[in-house]
């Protein structure tokens, strides 16, 4: 029965694009269906979707492996990058056993023979129905890439862009992602200062919501609700976010809420 995929592909290809489509459909039907790649992909993703614990395991393992890879992207791992890895472990409130495992995974990612594509492919398949988790993963990686405090080097940015392409997050724009991250960093520093002027760092507050000051009140409310829904800790955990990362998700929603409240206060929004 290994000819069914070819037949279906040929029929669809001919209907959509005539004789040329027939040839293309023959090839796609053979490679994707008859050779079992589609079946294998479906079985893998369906299995991951039905096992949240599997998603949590893959997410945790890939997060620390790729953090190690990103840290070593420019040839060496700095003290600031090691400190960032430890900070993530602290935020996750890992016990001694899990810390040792996280360190092992981080070290594994630094090795020259680390297979980035294989690791990302496993994560992508596990989270194929959970793009919100992939966004959390990317946020952790850009934090690592920026740990030196000197901005993103060309090598680190190239690695991040490669990771984004491999994960194939629908509707994801890397440049917007990096811009929002920078705004969040600036806004966090603003929050740690004593000034109470709500107009300070207002542009960064807009960027935290993925907007500009030209946005309408309606657009601001819509973006706020969307981001709060995307990053809600309980929702993320239900989708497969490891329980240890709940604190990080909570901090994210708190920052989104503070940015929204600052904008609302300046605009006198109801």
Curated annotation (Swiss-Prot):
<dbReference type="InterPro" id="IPR036869">
    <property type="entry name" value="J_dom_sf"/>
</dbReference>
<keyword id="KW-0472">Membrane</keyword>
<protein>
    <recommendedName>
        <fullName>Co-chaperone protein DjlA</fullName>
    </recommendedName>
</protein>
<feature type="topological domain" description="Cytoplasmic">
    <location>
        <begin position="31"/>
        <end position="270"/>
    </location>
</feature>
<keyword id="KW-0997">Cell inner membrane</keyword>
<dbReference type="InterPro" id="IPR050817">
    <property type="entry name" value="DjlA_DnaK_co-chaperone"/>
</dbReference>
<keyword id="KW-1133">Transmembrane helix</keyword>
<dbReference type="Pfam" id="PF00226">
    <property type="entry name" value="DnaJ"/>
</dbReference>
<keyword id="KW-0143">Chaperone</keyword>
<dbReference type="InterPro" id="IPR007791">
    <property type="entry name" value="DjlA_N"/>
</dbReference>
<feature type="transmembrane region" description="Helical">
    <location>
        <begin position="7"/>
        <end position="30"/>
    </location>
</feature>
<dbReference type="InterPro" id="IPR029024">
    <property type="entry name" value="TerB-like"/>
</dbReference>
<keyword id="KW-0812">Transmembrane</keyword>
<dbReference type="InterPro" id="IPR023749">
    <property type="entry name" value="DjlA"/>
</dbReference>
<comment type="function">
    <text>Regulatory DnaK co-chaperone. Direct interaction between DnaK and DjlA is needed for the induction of the wcaABCDE operon, involved in the synthesis of a colanic acid polysaccharide capsule, possibly through activation of the RcsB/RcsC phosphotransfer signaling pathway. The colanic acid capsule may help the bacterium survive conditions outside the host.</text>
</comment>
<dbReference type="Pfam" id="PF05099">
    <property type="entry name" value="TerB"/>
</dbReference>
<dbReference type="GO" id="GO:0005886">
    <property type="term" value="C:plasma membrane"/>
</dbReference>
<keyword id="KW-1003">Cell membrane</keyword>
<feature type="domain" description="J">
    <location>
        <begin position="204"/>
        <end position="270"/>
    </location>
</feature>
<dbReference type="GO" id="GO:0051087">
    <property type="term" value="F:protein-folding chaperone binding"/>
</dbReference>
<feature type="topological domain" description="Periplasmic">
    <location>
        <begin position="1"/>
        <end position="6"/>
    </location>
</feature>
<dbReference type="InterPro" id="IPR001623">
    <property type="entry name" value="DnaJ_domain"/>
</dbReference>
<comment type="subunit">
    <text>Homodimer.</text>
</comment>
């Amino acid at each position: 029965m290994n000819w069914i995929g070819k037949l279906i592909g040929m029929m669809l290809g001919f209907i959509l694009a005539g004789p040329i489509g027939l040839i293309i459909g023959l090839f796609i039907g053979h490679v994707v269906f008859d050779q079992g790649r589609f079946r294998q992909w479906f079985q893998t993703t369906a299995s991951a979707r039905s096992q949240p614990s599997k998603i949590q395991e893959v997410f945790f393992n890939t997060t620390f492996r790729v953090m190690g890879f990103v840290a070593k992207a420019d040839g060496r791992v700095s003290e600031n990058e090691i400190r960032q890895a430890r900070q993530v472990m602290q935020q996750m409130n890992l016990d001694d056993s899990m810390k040792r495992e996280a360190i092992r995974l981080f070290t594994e990612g630094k090795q020259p023979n680390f297979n980035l594509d294989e690791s990302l492919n496993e994560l992508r398949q596990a989270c194929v129905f959970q793009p919100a988790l992939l966004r959390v993963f990317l946020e952790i990686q850009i934090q690592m890439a920026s740990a030196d405090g000197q901005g993103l080097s060309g090598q680190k940015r190239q690695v991040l862009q490669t990771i984004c392409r491999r994960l194939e997050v629908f509707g994801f724009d890397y440049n917007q992602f990096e811009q929002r991250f920078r705004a969040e960093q600036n806004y966090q520093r603003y929050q740690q200062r004593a000034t109470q002027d709500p107009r300070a760092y207002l542009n960064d507050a807009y960027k935290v919501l993925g907007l500009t000051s030209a946005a309408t009140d309606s657009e601001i409310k819509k973006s706020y609700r969307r981001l709060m829904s995307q990053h809600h800790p309980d929702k993320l955990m239900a989708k497969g976010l490891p329980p240890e990362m709940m604190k990080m998700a909570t901090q994210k929603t708190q920052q989104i809420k503070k940015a929204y409240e600052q904008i609302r206060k300046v605009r006198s929004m109801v």
